[in-house]
Amino acid sequence: MSQQLSREEQERKYPEYTWDLTTIFKDDEAFEAAFKEVENELGKEEQFKGHIGDSAETLYNALELEDTLGTKLEKVYVYAHLKQDQDTTNDKYTGMESRAHQLIIKFSSAWSFLVPEILQIDEDKIQSFVNSYDKLQKFAFDLKLINEKRPHILDAETEKLLTEAQDALSTPSNVYGMFSNADLVFEDAIDKDGNAHPLTQGTFIKYLESDDRKLRESAFRNVYKAYGAHNNTLGATLAGEVKKNVFNARTHNYKTAREKALSNNHIPENVYDNLVKTVHKYLPLLHRYTELRKELLGLDDLKMYDLYTPLIKDIKFEMPYEEAKEWMLKALEPMGEEYLNVVKEGLNNRWVDVYENKGKRSGGYSSGAHLTNPFILLNWSNTISDLYTLVHEFGHSAHSYFSRKFQPSNSSDYTIFVAEVASTCNEALLSDYMDKHLDDEKRLLLLNQELERFRATLFRQTMFAEFEHKIHAIEESGEPLTPTRMNEEYAKLNKLYFGDSVETDEDINKEWSRIPHFYMNYYVYQYATGYSAAQSLSHQILTEGKPAVDRYINEFLKKGSSNYPIEILKNAGVDMTTPEPIEQACEVFEQKLNAFEKLMKA
C-alpha cells in the first residue's frame, strides 16, 4: 500500500481500508444542518436560569435538555475531527473542526449555571425530587456526584473569581509546553562514524534504541545538556505548577492536592500508596532485568542511555494488515462470541482507517460518540507494534460500543481511571496467544518487547507517581521546593528503582524537567494502575473462562460511568484498594523474565 496517496486517491482506490464517516452524516451538508440545529438550540437554557429548584420536573427537563444537546454536539464534533485527522492539509475540515470546537465552548459557557444552581438546592430536597419523579432516576448518580462536591464548592462569586483565575494559574504549564516543544533546541547527536543526526523531541527515543552506543550517549548527553542549562527556570516552572495544585486544593477545602485530584474519580488515596508500596516490594525483579540487560549487551557498565536499545535484533517479523486481523481474532477468542461479534462488526463495517496517506494525522487512536460507531485511526506499516496498536484500539472501541449500547448517554463515557484497562487487557490476551504460537526466535522478540512494556508502564510510571507526590508533599509541608531539591529527590528514586546495575549520573537527575506528565496533576499513576488491573483481568479470563468473561463484559465494559470506577472494577473481579492486582502484574513480569532468560540460554 503506497504511503504517498492523497486522501481522495486512498478513498477511491482502497475504500475498504478507510473508515466510513457517512454512518455519522451522509455528507458535509448534513453535518452543516446538524451544526445549525445545535447552534439554534443554544439559548433554550435561559428558561431554566433561576428555576432549577422549582420542581422535580423542571430539574429533569433542564438535565435532559443539556444531555440531549451535548450528545448531538458530540456527534457534530466527532465528524469534524475525524475529517480533519484523515487529511490535516485540508483547510475545509480544519475550519469545520475549529467551528465545532468553538461551539463546544459556547455550549459549556451557556450551561455553566447548571451545577451551581443545583448546589443551591437543599440535598434532602434533591433526594425527594429523585424519589418522587421516576424520570430523574436517569440522573440519580450524576446528582449524587454533584452532592458529594458540596463541602468543596464555595459561594458563586468566589467560584467565578477562581474560574477566571485559572487561565493565569495555567501559566507554568503553558510556559513549559512552549519552552519544551517550541523553543528548546538540541545539538546534533553524533554517531560512531562522526556523522551528525538532527536531535529533536521526536528523534530522541529513536536514537536511544539504536545499536550505536556512541549515538545513544550523544543523544542522551545533548538532551540533558539543553534541559540542564535551564534547570533553575524549569524548577521554578514546575514549582509553580505544584503551587497551583496546592492552592486549588486548599481553597476548595481539601487537605492535599492529591486528595482533590483523586476525588474527581472518587479514588481512595490508599490506591495510590498501595501502588507505590507494592511496586517497591518487587523492585528486585527490575534490578534482575537490568542486570540481564547489562550481561546481554556485553557491557561492563550499564548507563541510563542503554535501557532502550532492543536486546533482540535482526529478526524480521512482517505483519501485513490482513494477517494481523487473523491474529487478533484468534487471540480474542477467549472473550467469547458476544465480544468477538463486536470486533468483527468493526472490521467488516469500516470502523478502521488503516493506512497512511498524505496529511493524515500520525499515531493511532479510538474515537467516536454516543450516537456514532467507534472509529479507529491507524498508520499501518506492517510491524508487530501495529498489531498491538490494532488490538489496543479495538479494546477501547469495544469498551465504548458496550458502554454506549447499555448505558444512557449521560453515563456512557467511562472515566480516565479505567480507560486503559480494556485496551491493555486485549494486549495481554494477544501476548498470551502469540507466546503459544510463535517459534522461539520470534518469542524472544515478543518477550523483549513485553518486558520493556512492563518496565516503561508499571515501574517507570510508578516512579513518576512517587516523585510527583513527593514534590507536592514538600510544598505542602512548607519546605522550599527548589531545583536542587528536585534533582536530589529524583536521584534517590532512580537509585531505588534501578539498583546498582545501572549507573546514574547528574544528567538523569534532571529527567523530571522533560516529563510533561508532571503538569497533569496526579494523572500518571493511572497508567500503572490500569496496566495492573488489565493484567489481573486477563489472567482471570484465561484461567477461569466464561465466569470471568461474563463479569468482565457485564460488570465492566457495559457499565460506562454508572458507578464509581473503583466499584466497577471490583465487580469485574479486581480490587485496586488491595495489593493483589499489582502483585499479579509483577508476577506476570517475573514469569516473562524467567521465560526470556530460559530462551536466551537455550
Locate predicted features.
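Short pre-active-site segment immediately N-terminal to the catalytic Zn-binding motif
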Residues: 317-319, 369-391
